[in-house]
Amino acid sequence: MAGGPRRGGRRRKKVCYFTANGITHIDYKDTELLKRFISERGKILPRRVTGTSAKYQRMLTLAIKRSRHMALLPYVKEEQ
């Protein structure tokens, strides 16, 4: 049963964080918000993991890339 919910467990429907909180603009300078959508290795998390809608995922990706370019966020995290 690869890919299915675990024995009797029901998956919770993911809700878009931005829609639920009424956020209409994602600012590239708000690094604390952007860090919520980046993996521990520094990669942008996909929609299927975060539950973000397509519209806000595009805005989020653009904001993260701008933030990286301005050196507010790292491109990759260092190994320890």
Curated annotation (Swiss-Prot):
Keywords: Ribonucleoprotein, Ribosomal protein, RNA-binding, rRNA-binding. GO terms for biological process: translation. InterPro entries: Ribosomal_bS18, Ribosomal_bS18_CS, Ribosomal_bS18_sf. The keyword Ribonucleoprotein applies. Signal peptide: none annotated. It comes from the Bacteria. One of its GO terms (molecular function) is structural constituent of ribosome. GO terms for cellular component: cytosolic small ribosomal subunit. Part of the 30S ribosomal subunit. Forms a tight heterodimer with protein bS6. NCBIfam families: S18. HAMAP family: Ribosomal_bS18. Binds as a heterodimer with protein bS6 to the central domain of the 16S rRNA, where it helps stabilize the platform of the 30S subunit. PANTHER family: 30S RIBOSOMAL PROTEIN S18, SMALL RIBOSOMAL SUBUNIT PROTEIN BS18M. Belongs to the bacterial ribosomal protein bS18 family. This is Small ribosomal subunit protein bS18. It comes from Staphylococcus saprophyticus subsp. saprophyticus (strain ATCC 15305 / DSM 20229 / NCIMB 8711 / NCTC 7292 / S-41). The gene is rpsR.
